[in-house]
Amino acid sequence: MSDTTELVDLAVIFPDLEIELKYACADNITGKAIYQQARCLLHKDAITALAKSISIAQLSGLQLVIYDAYRPQQAQAMLWQACPDPQYVVDVTVGSNHSRGTAIDLTLRDEHGNILDMGAGFDEMHERSHAYHPSVPPAAQRNRLLLNAIMTGGGCFVGISSEWWHFELPQAASYPLLADQFSCFISPGTQHVS
């Protein structure tokens, strides 16, 4: 594993960016807070890409809302314990792109302050969360397309098919896994990953 000198704090770089870290509260697949600290970190190589996406969103009168970025390996182990399905959660032995600092989870807020309906919530691990699932109503499909265009419009991020909210750098998996940057709450049965 590599050190974490490649990570930057999004709250410092983008002070107006809305950050709602879902794993720092109970609003996630585990039903409990995982992160002991609400730190939103991302690999320095993704900062230019995110800046482009923020600008594209603003042109549309929208705002990005960040749900997750860098994720400690210990947190990944807890997510795997809650949902051991490789279609939705990467086994900690493989290593998540979040644990490389190269992936980000997010949604959109409109000019009236409303989160756009995406047809399925964050961390809903079922087919309706897939990027273009036919059961998602047309209005929510359009919102997903809008999010996808904002994130991929600068040619800097790519999405994945199983989660409408997840975007990552191209070749994200080629980056090294990073040492845990902050602590997580330990749940029974979760082993610390070094």
Regions found by a protein language model. Give the residues of each.
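Segments that shape or occlude catalytic/ligand-binding pockets
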Residues: 72
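Extracytoplasmic cell-surface/polysaccharide-interacting catalytic and binding patches
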Residues: 1-69, 81-194
